């Protein structure tokens, strides 16, 4: 429903604040903790969130501005292991802060023209699946929450 989507957009809008509440408590020695053996470190998760949500923003722009376009896939594990994954988390957090402000405003504007915007799609070339703007909103609202829970779990498990 439109009400559910509005709530998901609010989740996207407020995600950086929720993330800040958690990462502001992290000690320097905890940034390399992981929620499971072989999983990404907290630092990698924060960088992944910036990478992933930048891609989501671009995908949102493609859906809104183009007809019949494709998602540009990327290897999230390769990105999470790239050189910038060792950089300080602050840069990625600042990206998320600005990005989510702009992204949520774009999504809120899209909801005003819901009948036309929410049904527009992108094609995912690997699966052939059509992904709508509604799908993206739902996916990325839960994506942030999912990784926030991983960070919390890593911190709890380390104590």
Where are these regions (language model features)?
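Glutamate identity and glutamate-enriched acidic tracts
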Residues: 4, 11, 18, 28, ...
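Short, contiguous alpha-helical
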Residues: 32-77, 105, 118-159
């Amino acid at each position: 429903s439109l009400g559910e989507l509005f709530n998901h957009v609010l989740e996207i809008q407020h995600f950086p604040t929720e993330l800040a509440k958690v990462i502001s408590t992290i000690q320097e020695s905890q940034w390399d903790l992981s929620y499971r053996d072989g999983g990404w470190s907290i630092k990698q998760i924060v960088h992944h969130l910036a990478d992933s949500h930048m891609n989501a923003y671009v995908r949102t722009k493609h859906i809104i501005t183009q007809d019949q376009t494709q998602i540009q896939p990327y290897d999230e594990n390769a990105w999470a292991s790239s050189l910038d994954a060792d950089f300080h988390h602050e840069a990625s957090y600042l990206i998320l802060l600005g990005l989510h402000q702009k992204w949520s405003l774009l999504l809120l504007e899209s909801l005003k023209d819901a009948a036309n915007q929410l049904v527009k799609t992108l094609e995912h070339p690997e699966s052939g699946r059509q992904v709508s703007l509604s799908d993206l909103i739902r996916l990325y609202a839960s994506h942030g929450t999912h990784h926030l829970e991983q960070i919390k779990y890593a911190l709890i498990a380390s104590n």
